[in-house]
Structures are given as C-alpha cells and as structure tokens.
Amino acid sequence: MKPLSSPLQQYWQTVVERLPEPLAEESLSAQAKSVLTFSDFVQDSVIAHPEWLTELESQPPQADEWQHYAAWLQEALCNVSDEAGLMRELRLFRRRIMVRIAWAQTLALVTEESILQQLSYLAETLIVAARDWLYDACCREWGTPCNAQGEAQPLLILGMGKLGGGELNFSSDIDLIFAWPEHGCTQGGRRELDNAQFFTRMGQRLIKVLDQPTQDGFVYRVDMRLRPFGESGPLVLSFAALEDYYQEQGRDWERYAMVKARIMGDSEGVYANELRAMLRPFVFRRYIDFSVIQSLRNMKGMIAREVRRRGLTDNIKLGAGGIREIEFIVQVFQLIRGGREPSLQSRSLLPTLSVIAALHLLSENDAEQLRVAYLFLRRLENLLQSINDEQTQTLPSDELNRARLAWAMDFADWPQLTGALTAHMTNVRRVFNELIGDDESETQEESLSEQWRELWQDALQEDDTTPVLAHLSEDDRKQVLTLIADFRKELDKRTIGPRGRQVLDHLMPHLLSDVCAREDAAVTLSRITALLVGIVTRTTYLELLSEFPAALKHLISLCAASPMIASQLARYPLLLDELLDPNTLYQPTATDAYRDELRQYLLRVPEDDEEQQLEALRQFKQAQLLRIAAADIAGTLPVMKVSDHLTWLAEAMIDAVVQQAWVQMVARYGKPNHLNEREGRGFAVVGYGKLGGWELGYSSDLDLIFLHDCPMDAMTDGEREIDGRQFYLRLAQRIMHLFSTRTSSGILYEVDARLRPSGAAGMLVTSAEAFADYQKNEAWTWEHQALVRARVVYGDPQLTAHFDAVRREIMTLPREGKTLQTEVREMREKMRAHLGNKHRDRFDIKADEGGITDIEFITQYLVLRYAHEKPKLTRWSDNVRILELLAQNDIMEEQEAMALTRAYTTLRDELHHLALQELPGHVSEDCFTAERELVRASWQKWLVEE
C-alpha cells in the first residue's frame, strides 16, 4: 500500500486528536490510518460506531459481498415493527455498507467496476426492502390492491439513470418512476380504496421512508421528476397510463432517460416483463433514427450553457470531456441503432461500449480511450464524494482535499493528477465533437439567439443569472424566470404532440426576446403565457405565431396594453387570425358598415344551422371588439368614437338576432295576419341607457324593451296557428335566448329588459298603445328620466315614428320645477346610498358624487324641466349632444355645458381604459378632483338650489 503523502501525514495528527479511546492510534492498522485520513465520512462513522472499524479489520470488504446485502438487511429488519424503526434500520444499514465501500475504494481493494456495482445494488436492496415492508403494512391497513380478476397488484419501481445502469455514484440521489399494472380496488381492508389511491399513498410513504432526514441522516434523496408530466403528474401511474403517455407525448430526452431504466427487485416476474416489453418500442426504434443526434446535441448544449451560467468550472461530470459526454457518445449509438441491434440495448455503459467497438461503430482506439477515461473519471468522482459523503463533481480548491485525491488516485501531487485528467478529458472531447459536436463558431446574433433558447429550454432557477434579463429589476427578473418555469410545468400536464413541442421550441425564444426587451416584461409575459396555455394543444395557432413574426409582435403589444384583450384571445383563440393583417386590426369597420359586414359574414354559415349561426354571431362580435380595442389602444379612436363603434356593432347584432328569431318563429307559426295589410314586421326594439345614449363600453350589457303594434284579434297564418300577440311574446323570448345562450364562444350580450312597463313584473313585449298609456298614466319620474336616453335601435318606420312621438310627448309634458327637482335629487341620493362609496379612499367614477351618473341626472332633469318650452331638447338621446342643445337653447351657459362635456368624456375615457385593463371602475380618491368639483357645483346649481 502506498504511504501517505507529506500533507496527509501532517493531517493524520489532527485525526488522532478526534479519535475516542477505543480507537487509540496504536491499535489502528496502516490501512485504517490511510482511510481515516482520506475520508471524513468514514472517520465520523467509525467514531459513532467503533464496532464497524473492528468488523472492517477482521472482515475486509470483498468484491462479491453485494450478493449478501439483501440477507444482511433482512436480518436487520426482522424485528422492525413500525415505520420509525424501519427508517432507522435502513439509514444505519446504508451508512455501514457505505463505510465498507469507501474503505474498499480508498485502498483500491476492488476494481472501479465492482465499486459501481456495489453502490447500485446497495441502493436497489434498500429501495426494494422498504417497498416490500411498506406494501405489507399498507395491505394490512387498507387491503390488498387487486385487478378485476382478484389478482394482487404489485408496485413496480423503475430505477433510472445511473441507478438503472448499475453505475451509481458514491453520494447520489436516485431517480425513480412508480407504476402498477391494472386498475381495480383493494380487497380485505376496513374500507375499499381504488388502486390509484392505494399506490399513491404507498408511494408517498416510500419516498418519506427513503428521503426524509432524521437524526440518522437519510437513505437517499429521491427524485421523481422523470415520471410522465414531471412534478405536475400523478406520483404513480398504471401501465396503461404509462403506455399512453410514452406513445403520445414521449420526448427525446425521455427516450434518452429510459435507455437506462431498470425494474428494481424481481425483474423477471410477469408484470416486470410486461412493463419492459411495453417500454422497449418507445426507447429503441425499429428504424435507424438519426434525429437523435440533433436531440442529444441540443441536450448537450443545455448542459454546456448550465455549466457557463452556474460557473461550473472544474466539473468532471458536466464539463467538456466529462462523464456526461462519454454517456452521450454511447447513447447516441444505442438510440440510433438499438432497435436494429439488440446487443446495444444494455443499460450499462462499459458493456455497451465494448459492443460499439465490436460493431466497428467506433475505432478500437477511440473505444479504449473512452473506457479508460470513464473508469478514471468515475473513480475520481466517487473518491471526491466519499470524502464527505457529498454530492459534488467539482474538483476541490483547498490543499488538503487536493492532496487526498492525488494520493488516492496514485499520483505524486495535484499537478500530476490534473495533467492526467486533462489528457483523458481531451480525448473524450475529441470523440464527442467528431460524433455529435457542433463546433461552428457562433456569430453575435446567433449567440444572442442561443441565450434566448437557453432562457426557454434550460429551466433556470430564480437565482440564476442570464445577460438577456440584466436590464430588468431583481424582482422582475425573478418573476420572469418563475413564469417560464410555471409555464413549462403547465405544459407537462397537456397532451402536446412532438410537432407542437417543436413549434413551441421555435416560437418561445423569439417571443421571449420580444417580451423581455420591454420594461413591463413580467406583466406582459404573465398575460401571454396564460393565453398560450389555452392554445398549446392546437398546433395551428402556435404555427401562426411562429411563422408570422408581425402577428407575434401585434400579440405582444396588445397583451401588454390590455389584459382584457389577452383574456379575449385566450378564451377565443380564433381571434388570433385577426393579428395577421394590421390594416384591418387597427382599422375598425366603418360605423355604417357593421350591418353589411355581418350579413356577409353570416352568408358563410347555413341559415338552418342554428348552432353555427350562434357561433358566427359571437365570433364576429369578438373580432370587431378586438379591432375597436386595438384602435383604442393605438390612439386612433377617441372615446366618443369608441362608443360609437361599440354601439353600431351592438345594433348590427340586434338586427341579425331579430332576423334569426323572426325566421325561426315564422317557420314554426307563420306571420301575424295583420301584416298582410302593411309592410314590415310590426315589431321594434328600443335601446335604453348606454345603448340608447350611444355610450356603450367594452363590457356593457344592453337595456332593451320590445314593442309591437299587433291588434287584439290577429292570428298567425301558419299551420300551427297562434294568437298574434303570443307570437310577439315568443319572438321576444327567442331573441333573449339567442343573446344569452352560452356557446363555446360565450354569450353574445347580457340583456336587461327590466325597464319595460311594470319592470320585471310586466309583459316581456308590450303593444305600442299600452306603452304610451303606461308612460302617460303610470310611469314614475325615473322612468321618464330613462326615456331621455331611449331610442329605437331596430324597427319598422311606422313603429319608430310612433315611439318617437310618445317619447317627445312624455318629455315635453309641463312639470312643476320644484317637485321634479326633489324627485330627481331623491332618486339620485337613493342610488348613491345603494351603489356609491363602496370603496374607502376610492372614487367610483360612475356612481360616486361628482361622477358620470350625476352628469346624466343633470341632463335628464334639465330636459324634463324645459322640454315643454324648448321641444328641440328631445332630439338626441346622448349626453354630449343634449349638453350642446341645452347651451344652444339658452338653458345652460355654453361655458358650463362645454366644461361638463369635457368632464364627462374624460371620465368615460378613464372607464374605457380601466375596462381594457380589466380593472374595476374606481380610482384613487385624489384623481379627477377638478372634474368632480365642477360636477358638484353644477349639481348644486340645478338640483339643490331654489
């Protein structure tokens, strides 16, 4: 045995001072001194358990002792009666055997291949023993999980990565996937659980038993992220669910991982063979598959970027020429040719490397250089980790650990060790580059593009740095990284085919480069990822954004400006087509062309297909709404024009809905026979409120009443004859139904018909005569106020003329000024008490004192007060033009009318923009103070003072 080097002999004196009495220096062999000097882990362990050292001296580790692990562990577990006892015994057993392995490794008593085998089999033994103990315990508690035939169902565990390949590190976490064969329920328990519940609960307990730190440490860190759907997926899957996932969604990196998958424990049982046969076609393709090279190149690129980003210098696993590159080289051949060459289907690297050489896929010299380098690197890695039982692949920077490694690797000093290491890694890198390297030098633009790809594909953590986000604040940078990570997790839950993932991987770096260049990157990205989640399973939409950069830019700018637009696009992705043409996107339909555009749009849909007609109406509305909002955001539409467009759009929709309802009713009942003597339909729709006043907002509902002029004795002329007035009632009901039916594109509009005579208690549709009579004899003052903002939005000329005459007559009635003033003021005060001031320290733009409703009440009061003297005041139904009329007719001073108009449009503009931001209609108490003071003064002047 090689003597300790000078630095280690000096360190031995420090070790001696730590040793307890039973481990006196003179009682220790030269071997014990060497191992205790090399490994703090062994040192700590034998200080805690001196009997282990005695055992090591009397029964030194053997290469084949892994064959006894299962029996030794069973003996240790035979008296365990609870989970706490199980956890303790597993941890002590793992530590005792790891000390033996470290001893053998440090002294080179066995080959490196034997060390890897022992480490892997130890993990398998512990996992299987824990599983079997817990399975029995869970069956006693919940019953035995069985399939439909009553056959007991086991939990199968796939060991992934180095565990599966029999090449586990000294200090490694373990990657596992849990599966069970068939669905069914437990039998024999106190209550029945389905198999999914049983195995999920058992899986959770198994992870806890292995992973949870206690005073005895842990057994292994357990990583379950390689399972289908990753962290967001079920903990345990049935064979059928596994098969569906890998056939439909399995990705290249999952094929790569599955090469090494090995069933823990009884690997020759019926269910184990079934699982293995099911997975094999996914991993090993029947044809020669050269697409693997690019996939592995991409994966290697991700690793290289991680090394750069995290500053992983001196990393013997991930660095250039490291262990990972040897694994990549071997698995390239397995994945390309494994389906045709069964001899390449081995999980272990070294046997596969021999097959590769035998098949002349690599030269004998290259294969031998890789084999030697692999064993050198793995020994160095395991020695490094055994110093402190620490999961690291980074070479030490301190002199003591460098001296330890140089001695254990049989080199005189650290420079000699690093020289040999460099030679091995250079050989590996050369072979790697010849096979799958991508050594072309990058341009600056390509480098930047690569950084965006890194941001998307490499699952950066919050504390990772990346230059492309350097301009953002620390909070925004973290939020962007979190959003990307959350989006990727969400994708794992979705059924996205290979083509969809390919398109996403092309789209996302471009999207991120555009979004993250903005100062509001975090907010914008949150809106866009929410939208993308809704369309990721529909590759066509992803391709639209990927292939049309201009559409992507419009999407980003609109989503940045308005969460309302982002929400609309997320709910109705068909609207993404609108992004293709900026000429139409930012140019709403002419106000007088909505009806014609809609008519043309509906020609594409069969007239007798009600469902498609309903969808088409909603899709047209949403597309037009998007254009109006886009123009609003771009600043090409002032607030009055926005409302004009929204109002004309609503009128076009009303026209089409009435037409559709009319056709359906006539087909069923025929037409009312009084129409034989006249043209038209004898029907009108009156718009109140914002619709009547040309003041619709983005989310306004429609206040409507329905009128007809059908005589009492009219009947329909169809085969199913009904009373004429009954026909109009059913027509109105049908109209309400067409507006409110929820399709996949939502509802058309919320419709409120409570402003009809007698409100909700009255008939849904009213005759023109009854309406006139009600307004003259029964209506309250507030109903006359509402009439100020009412107009016919659909109807025959003669019914329209009749309504206009009734409206004019009611509004020009002489009224006693003081009484009217009191009634209007008291109604407003009631409204304010009910609706206003709900938010402390906030100003409700519509409902609070000095807001929009006060201006509306002022105009309504003045029209009702003075229209008897000035009938021209009844001409318009919108507030802005009523204010003009009040000034023109010398009722209000022009300066006051203009000031109120400015205040009104300013407040309306703010409401529009709050709607685009999906924010409620209230602002800080200190906003719009000038406008509110002006409105208060006007209110005081007209509705309070004598």
From Swiss-Prot:
Region annotated Adenylyl removase, chain positions: 1-440
Protein name per Swiss-Prot or TrEMBL: Bifunctional glutamine synthetase adenylyltransferase/adenylyl-removing enzyme
GO BP term (any one): regulation of glutamine family amino acid metabolic process
Catalytic reaction equation(s): [glutamine synthetase]-O(4)-(5'-adenylyl)-L-tyrosine + phosphate = [glutamine synthetase]-L-tyrosine + ADP; [glutamine synthetase]-L-tyrosine + ATP = [glutamine synthetase]-O(4)-(5'-adenylyl)-L-tyrosine + diphosphate
Pfam family, one: GlnE
Protein family membership: Belongs to the GlnE family.
Gene that this sequence comes from: glnE
Cofactors: Mg(2+)
Organism of provenance: Escherichia coli O9:H4 (strain HS)
UniProt GO MF annotations: [glutamate-ammonia-ligase] adenylyltransferase activity; [glutamine synthetase]-adenylyl-L-tyrosine phosphorylase activity; ATP binding; magnesium ion binding
GO annotations of cellular component type: cytosol
InterPro entries: GlnE, GlnE_rpt_dom, NT_sf, PII_UdlTrfase/GS_AdlTrfase
Lineage, opening ranks: Bacteria, Pseudomonadati, Pseudomonadota, Gammaproteobacteria, Enterobacterales
Keywords: ATP-binding, Magnesium, Multifunctional enzyme, Nucleotide-binding, Nucleotidyltransferase, Transferase
E.C. code: 2.7.7.89, 2.7.7.42
